[in-house]
Amino acid sequence: MLTTPFTRSDWEAKAAALKPEGRAFIDGRYVPALSGKTFTKTSPIDGRVIAEVADCGAEDIEAAVKAARTAFEDGRWRLKPPAEKKRILLRFAELVRADLEHLALLETLDVGKVIGNSLAVDVPFCADCIQYYAEFADKSFDEVAPTGPNDLAIVRREPLGVIGAIVPWNYPLIITAWKIGPALVAGNCVVLKPAEQSPLSALRLGELARQAGLPDGVLNVVPGFGEKAGKPLALHQDVDMISFTGSTEVGKLMLRYAGESNMKRVALECGGKSPHVVLADADLDAAASGIAWGIYYNQGETCHAGSRVIAHASIKDELVRKIGEVAAQQIPLGHPLDPAAQMGALVEKGHMERVLSYIDIGTREGATIAHGGSRVMAETGGYYVEATILDGVEPQHRVAREEIFGPVVVVSTFTDENEALRMANDSIYGLAAAVWTGNMNAAHRFTSGIRAGTVWVNCFDRSSLATPFGGFRQSGFGRDRSPHAIEKYMDFKTVWTAYS
């Protein structure tokens, strides 16, 4: 269980003293929205006000894009020697690490995730990601193509220009780093639009980047709502790429906006409905642990959460019992500033109501609640839902097909492998999957047959910055993480020279 050196009361005292920055970060400084408007950011932990945030619109996006374009064209970042880029980005990573408690508290207050995870996972992973990509600054080479003896063809990789990065609220720091790390090391300038539910840590990153030596205009952070700020960014004629993580519905809008504007490049990481296929010979203790942590971690607010269990009929009942035991014994729901809590608050009231509505839909469709199923801790003023198991779910049920994005796992059964594979692939999504079995031949058949960007065998949610992350089908295209992510922020130029 994650622990911290502070008690809940210590963190509450720190939270009471915190004065988060809510202004936009444009061209190296904090500025109010040009309209003067703000919106009130409340914490899902208890509903209290934590900041007034700049309610940015098209005019602020215009200012940020102009700053980024100017910085790109004059070469203040693009033309820096690789060793200097590396030094600045490594310094950026170190400043993130040094700001651990501050960033972790912002993240927890903003979105309701537990402080232990913000400290041990979100902030360190953000720093590690920036460091990982910094190391590529002086290790990436152009290529010489094999041509005739009197020709020289150099294949160069060049930055795209201005990148619009739109990130979601579930992992603000981590997903921001997934985007700005490779984009910056490639030599681009970035306009970052955090989700309106989670602007505070991204705004802090802007200042840390400035302290690290990143030139003005290279990283801009513009908070605001999707329709007012995200849409103008995606439609902007001077933005060369949109890198988006969020819902499939909005991802489709990004494609439309790209076509309606300048045919900018688009990379999408969208929704998921990841299946666990549990064969009859699986280690049920290991499977139950992987399933429980894979859906209840971060309150189920994870795009690749293992939200579907497809279990062999002979072991289903025992598996369901074991999942419930893991949830009850190892993943306590509690106040997010309590270091002992492993599940916290859902991000906002509307989202909590949506999750609860899906539990109701599932029971009306014929499923039974095998564990949890209710709102709890309502007296806090926050938005908490129990770890929930819906059993007896059929593949055609809405809860088996639609992304709930909360602490709800649905359980269905199969009797033969072909049926299980069909069920696993019976989804518009293809982000991730897992197969649990002691038979490696069966595991190979499933890893080959499942249409998903990541497939785990006898584990779940193992990850590394060295491995690409992204999905098939309506889970999107393009990959975050790994060296492969850098190339999506670059273009290829071939330079021919003829010799006599």
Regions found by a protein language model. Give the residues of each.
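Conserved C-terminal structural/oligomerization subdomain of aldehyde/semialdehyde dehydrogenase
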Residues: 48-51, 239, 277, 343, ...
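Rossmann-like NAD(P) dinucleotide-binding subdomain of oxidoreductase/dehydrogenase enzymes
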Residues: 141-286, 414
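Residue-level signal for inorganic ion chemistry
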Residues: 47, 85, 107, 187, ...
